[in-house]
Amino acid sequence: GVEVNGLTLVGKADHQGTGIFVEHDNDRLHFFNIRMENMYQGIKLQGCDAITLARIDATDAVNGIEMNGGIQNMVTNSLFGSAQGGVAARISGESNLIFSHNKLTAEDDRCASFTGCSRVNISDNEFTGNKMTFFDISGQNNLISDNVFTVNRSDNQLNGKEADYGVIHVKGEYNHFTSNTIHADWSDGIENPVTVNAAEGENNRFASFTIENTNSNQVFYVSESPE
């Protein structure tokens, strides 16, 4: 394997370039203590296996981190941000990923999406943003535990979605949400916005939730399709 440690990566003016781009099965790469400045994409991983990212600062980026089709990767103790319509974390098709002890902040649009993932452990993270399109997850056998989700007031808080879309929007099977905390402060004029929407799938479990949802009488929504 290869270890990369202690770098500051600076993009061109007005957020251009990618800080770290790894593609294909580059086994056992380790990235530690790396800071991104003025980047369009902080980190992009395509089809990678057993990569470790720790103590990464990709807050000064349009898109913080993007991962696709990897196996047994780890992202921990890192900072990711987004701006200008980007996404702090866009994760798709990952399996056996550990995503823990990270802080993600989205200025607008989505904070994090985990699409088509399996056996992913998302634990002890802090997610902060200001839009309804906040946290999406689909797939199966994922664990989402001990996270703090905070949605602050903003203009255009629904971001093109209906009020029942849900801050946490879940599709899939056998996903387990436990011991999470959600703070949702809704802007005036939004009628009964939903905090958690179990939109599709079966055998998803929600336990030991703390939900602080101001200005809404509709907190947890289960559509007709889940079983």
Locate the predicted segments by residue.
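Extracellular parallel beta-helix/beta-solenoid repeat domains
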Residues: G1-E227
